[in-house]
Curated annotation (Swiss-Prot):
Residues 34-43 have a biased composition (Polar residues). Interacts (via N-terminus and PTB domain) with ROCK1. Found in a complex, at least composed of ITGB1BP1, KRIT1 and RAP1A. Interacts (via C-terminal region) with ITGB1 (via C-terminal cytoplasmic tail); the interaction prevents talin TLN1 binding to ITGB1 and KRIT1 and ITGB1 compete for the same binding site. Interacts with KRIT1 (via N-terminal NPXY motif); the interaction induces the opening conformation of KRIT1 and KRIT1 and ITGB1 compete for the same binding site. Isoform 2 does not interact with ITGB1. Keywords: Angiogenesis, Biomineralization, Cell adhesion, Cell membrane, Cell projection, Cytoplasm, Cytoskeleton, Differentiation, Membrane, Mitogen, Notch signaling pathway, Nucleus, Phosphoprotein, Transcription, Transcription regulation. Pfam families: ICAP-1_inte_bdg. Residues 1-57 are annotated as: Disordered. The lineage of its organism: Eukaryota, Metazoa, Chordata, Craniata, Vertebrata. Key regulator of the integrin-mediated cell-matrix interaction signaling by binding to the ITGB1 cytoplasmic tail and preventing the activation of integrin alpha-5/beta-1 (heterodimer of ITGA5 and ITGB1) by talin or FERMT1. Plays a role in cell proliferation, differentiation, spreading, adhesion and migration in the context of mineralization and bone development and angiogenesis. Stimulates cellular proliferation in a fibronectin-dependent manner. Residues 58-200 form the PID domain. It comes from Pongo abelii (Sumatran orangutan). Residues 11-29, 47-57 have a biased composition (Low complexity). A motif (Nuclear localization signal) lies at residues 6-7. This is Integrin beta-1-binding protein 1.
């Protein structure tokens, strides 16, 4: 295995974009990222909506992904250090190097369904549910190139528990950065829809 393949392919134009429920503006502050491709981040820690609603928000978009692993029940103090996209990416990198998370996921594919209720990850026959992430418990979603040179991307979710006392990180592998960005976009639309519907 290419453990030493963690060297990132350098690019003369490392770009990044941040998708936020507050704003859809491009944030180039992540330009120093040692990744060869775009990083997209969804910051859901917001109380404002961009005002864009989607009449199809009740539908569930489905994506085929693989499950890399999770780091669960991080203390509040640890979670506070994972505010930005780069914080999450660096934390996952270190966890992989320390053996807490694998570099490559098992071969089994799962179905990730994204709707206004949140995210559901189930087996490919959709008979068993692996994870459920309620929309209101999702704090941030980040997608980025895994750096292994196979064109795969990682999708990382930061969630909290109902009492807001602990954080967890969930890592999934997508077939491409485009697929990962599509998941971020659907989730962003779901947040917009819910926040818009809550307005008086």
């Amino acid at each position: 295995m290419f453990r030493k393949g963690k060297k990132r392919h350098s690019s003369s134009s490392s770009q990044s974009s941040e998708i936020s429920t507050k704003s859809k503006s491009v944030d180039s502050s992540l330009g120093g990222l040692s990744r060869s491709s775009t990083v997209a981040s969804l910051d859901t820690d917001s109380t404002k909506s961009s005002g864009q609603s989607n009449s199809n928000s009740d539908t569930c978009a489905e994506f085929r992904i693989k499950y890399v692993g999770a780091i669960e029940k991080l203390k509040l103090s640890e979670g506070k250090d994972l505010e930005g996209p780069l914080d999450l990416i660096n934390y996952i990198d270190v966890a992989q190097q320390d053996g807490k998370l694998p570099f490559v996921p098992p071969e089994e594919e799962f179905i990730m369904g994204v709707s206004k209720y949140g995210i559901k990850v189930s087996t490919s026959d959709q008979y068993d549910v692996l994870h459920r992430h309620a929309l209101y418990l999702i704090i941030r979603m980040v997608c980025y190139d895994d750096g292994l040179g196979a064109g795969k991307s990682l999708l990382a979710l930061k969630t909290t528990d109902a009492s807001n006392e602990e954080y967890s990180l969930w890592v999934y592998q997508c077939n491409s950065l485009e697929q990962a960005q599509a998941i971020c976009k659907v989730l962003s639309t779901a947040f917009d829809s819910v926040l818009t519907s809550e307005k008086p």
